């Protein structure tokens, strides 16, 4: 049986979804190692805290890092050989790690869920890889990456009660001003619209926490759980990042859940699943949404089109 090593951060639980997909669809033995953690290691007891203080002071070692990243370092050091090594966010690995990993496979691959413009440090790792994948069309053209769109992951779940007309899930970032404007407009015309934003450092207090339409939390919503929340809304809202030339995960989440979507990302027009019945492209500075878009039912898509954007298809593109 072929062997695949998958290395990725645990950000938003994306890694677990890909890991499960690799195990299910690759027909290979898959090893997964986390390269970076959303939450720092927490001491199990006061003895560990004292031990770490001693190690840092007298041995130049960090117990927290060794406990959290020990598995990654062990995989890098050992002599195992893999048919493929697939890495997300290679910029969180050291140059020495990348060189050692390259010696453990004939096919070292990377996939990028953020554009190079958004995370410039990713550029330094490109040369180590035999093949790179990205959802960003400009990066594919500029760096010779292979295009692999994001995907939908829709676990089987019971029908959820509809709570919202329009819902946005995301992080508290530079999009928030236009988010506030859109939410105020939608609620003003009578559509119950809300946003839940993640901010790792937030205690819920910010100028935007005063908005009745926005909830800010420092509790991370894993990727696999966000579907349950999104399924409680009739329509999903997607807002483009300034430094991306492709679609984020939200449009594909809408595909998997068969939900309508409002977006300000003009790239949506280039995809074969676009239809004005299901997707409304807006200008946040001049919002125009027809009443028909809200009142008419979702128009189901052809299964062949849906299949192109499934996790299974995404996995097959990566490992082929």
Label each residue range with its predicted role.
Residues 2-75, 79, 89-96, 113-248, ...:
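Nucleotide-sugar donor-binding catalytic core of glycosyltransferases
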Residues 86:
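N-terminal Rossmann-like NAD(P) cofactor-binding module of classical short-chain dehydrogenase/reductase
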Residues 102-112:
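Short beta-strand/loop segments at the ligand-binding rim of alpha/beta enzyme cores
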Residues 254-255:
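Short alpha-helix at the nucleotide-sugar/activated-sugar donor binding site of glycosyltransferases
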Residues 285-320:
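A charged, aromatic-enriched C-terminal amphipathic alpha-helix characteristic of glycosyltransferases
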């Amino acid at each position: 049986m072929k062997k695949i090593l998958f290395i990725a951060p645990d950000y938003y639980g994306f890694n677990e979804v890909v890991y499960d997909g690799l195990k299910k669809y690759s027909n290979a033995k898959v090893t997964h190692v986390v390269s970076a953690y959303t939450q720092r290691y927490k001491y199990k007891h006061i003895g560990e805290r004292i031990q770490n203080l001693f190690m840092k002071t007298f041995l130049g070692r960090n117990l927290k890092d060794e406990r959290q990243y020990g598995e990654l370092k062990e995989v890098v050091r050992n002599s195992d050989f893999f048919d493929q090594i697939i890495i997300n966010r290679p910029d969180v690995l050291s140059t020495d790690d990348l060189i050692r990993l390259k010696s453990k496979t004939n096919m070292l691959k990377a996939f990028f869920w953020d554009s190079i413009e958004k995370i410039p440090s990713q550029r330094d790792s490109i040369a180590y890889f035999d093949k790179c994948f990205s959802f960003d069309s400009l990066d594919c053209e500029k760096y010779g990456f292979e295009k692999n769109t994001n995907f939908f992951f829709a676990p089987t779940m019971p029908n959820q009660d509809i709570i919202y007309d329009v819902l946005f899930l995301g992080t508290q970032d530079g999009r928030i001003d236009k988010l506030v404007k859109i939410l105020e407009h939608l609620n003003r015309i009578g559509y119950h619209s809300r946003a839940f934003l993640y901010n790792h450092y937030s205690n819920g207090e910010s100028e935007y926490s005063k908005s009745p339409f926005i909830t800010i939390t420092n509790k991370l919503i894993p990727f696999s759980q966000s579907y349950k929340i999104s399924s409680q809304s009739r329509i999903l809202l997607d807002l483009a990042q300034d430094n991306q030339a492709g679609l984020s995960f939200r449009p594909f989440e809408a595909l998997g859940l068969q939900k309508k979507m409002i977006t300000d990302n003009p790239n949506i027009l280039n995809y074969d699943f676009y239809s004005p019945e299901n997707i409304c492209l807006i200008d946040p500075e001049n919002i125009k949404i027809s009443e028909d878009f809200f009142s008419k039912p979702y128009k189901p898509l052809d299964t062949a089109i849906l299949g192109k954007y499934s996790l299974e298809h995404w996995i097959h593109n990566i490992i082929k």
